[in-house]
Amino acid sequence: MSILGLLSGQARVEGSCMYKGMDLYRLPEKEMQKIRGKEIALIPQNPTESLNPIRRIGKQLTECMTVHGNKDKELADSRRDEFLRRFGFSDPDRINRAYSFQLSGGMNQRVISAMGLMNRPKWVIADEPTKGLDAILRRQVYRVLKEISETDTEGMIVITHDIALAGALCDRLMVLYKGSIMEAGETKTILEHPAHPYTKGLIASLPGKGMNPIGRAVRKKEGNSGCSFYPRCPHAVDACKNGRIPEAELPDGRKVRCVRYA
């Protein structure tokens, strides 16, 4: 949301986000409109907040192209139907005539995914793109996003709790806990040989790995000035409590924020 300038005026945004030599955080709205949805697109995780309930789905999909100056209605209609089919809708005409409240949550999630790809953007930010989908539809979304990432885009940022999706789509992985990066590196290396205690716990909690809980539940007000994972970590020591934990680089190139590697 911050990358595309979609946060409210009261939001606090720090740092910079460079794209083609431009800092997107300081770009005028008129210039951002040329980038948003065309060069950098977002697939949001809450379609009910993104789809207009009083406008037909088909109109909202084609508008993604016309708002950026594409007046070729035939091309817009063709691409709309193409993406609906790719996301598992065998009858695009029925979906085009429907309103969002007439579709299930999973159907709306696939609609919003198609919407984000209508302009064939160079970069895609996919926020929980498989949310609300069953196993069959999740695999279909995997395939579509994988194809798009390999053929139509320069890159894709995937924000997800779905580790299988991350493993299927991402070359590199960042594992976050309470807003802090715990571990970052090549996806295959992290998933096969996790280093940070949180990453290890996350993978051990998967159904195929025993569904082991990640430590004890943390009380809402519980916290410290050090590692945010400290209250749940099985390897916690006093050094974890205070001060910012330094980032360490492992021999395989991974970066881990943990005193065990400092």
PLM regions and their residue ranges:
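Catalytic Walker B motif of ABC-type/P-loop ATPase nucleotide-binding domains
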Residues: 124-127
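Conserved ABC transporter NBD signature motif
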Residues: 12-23
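Hydrophobic anchor residue at the start of the ABC signature
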Residues: 61, 113, 141
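Charged, flexible cofactor/metal-binding loops and thiol motifs
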Residues: 186-262
